[in-house]
Regions:
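Conserved class I S-adenosyl-L-methionine
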Residues: 1-37, 48, 72, 79-80, 134-161
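Conserved Class I S-adenosyl-L-methionine
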Residues: 172-212
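A short SAM/SAH-binding and catalytic strip from SAM-dependent methyltransferases
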Residues: 104-119, 141
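Class I SAM-dependent methyltransferase SAM/SAH-binding core
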Residues: 38-96, 120
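A short acidic, Gly/Pro-enriched loop at the edge of an enzyme's catalytic core
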Residues: 93-106
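Acceptor-substrate binding/catalytic loop of class I
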Residues: 143, 162-177
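A short glycine-rich, Lys/Arg-flanked "PGG" loop and its adjoining helix->strand segment in the class I
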Residues: 119-134
Length: 212
């Protein structure tokens, strides 16, 4: 079992999610979302990013591993009368229930960064993204001044990371090498990658776009 599932189902993480609403809305406003856009929100929680995207007219599917957060997300979607926004349980490292190239935008905000198998998650994100689509990640970074980021940085000093995951204190060069490796897993040619860049808003995000 994914250890995150047991942990997240023990508490009420919707209380934490409420403190992140502004971040999700700020990110969505910068993504150029249009009516009918096919969006996948990974590590969606109770819809911090998914609901704002759906309110702009996108067809949104949220996937997360804890049942309680998925149920909370579907409840919020019903309360806002958003029939174009649904949530389902799923392991981000194994999205076998989703077809290849099904989404024009794949987004994960403070979600995939916690996955025990980051490389597998990256492969799945690329697999389900249409050619010409976009992958957008919002992550805390080592020098992020927010309280949660500092807690994660301190705790990572005393706990070994799962296999394949980088510590927040790891060298930038190592992180960039991992980023290149993720890109190369999509194809033997890097022409599939349009651009990879860091963009900073209220909280930082990393965006990757793929093209034919």
């Amino acid at each position: 079992m994914n250890p995150n599932k047991a942990l997240l189902e023990k508490g009420d993480f919707t209380r934490i999610a409420k403190s992140m609403r502004e971040s999700g809305e700020a990110l969505v406003q910068r993504l150029g979302i249009t009516k009918g856009l096919k969006v996948l929100d990974l590590g969606c929680g109770d819809g911090t990013t998914a609901l704002p995207a759906a309110k702009l007219g996108a067809d949104v599917l949220g996937v997360d591993i804890p049942r309680n957060l998925v149920e909370a997300g579907n409840k919020r979607a019903r309360e806002h009368a958003l029939a174009n926004c649904t949530f389902q349980e799923g392991d981000l490292s194994d999205l076998h229930q989703l077809p290849d190239q099904a989404f024009e935008l794949v987004v994960t905000v403070f979600g995939a960064m916690f996955a025990p198998k980051p490389f597998e998650v990256a492969k799945e994100m690329v697999r389900v993204t249409r050619r010409g689509g976009r992958i957008v990640m919002g992550n805390w970074i080592p020098n992020d001044p927010t309280l949660v980021a500092q807690i994660l940085k301190i705790s990572s000093t005393y706990t070994p990371p799962p296999p394949g995951r980088l510590r927040q204190s790891d060298d930038v060069g190592d992180r960039e090498q991992r980023n290149r490796a993720i890109c190369w897993r999509r194809s033997s040619s890097r022409k599939n990658i349009l651009h990879a860049r860091h963009v900073y808003i209220q909280l930082p995000r990393r965006t990757v776009s793929a093209r034919k």
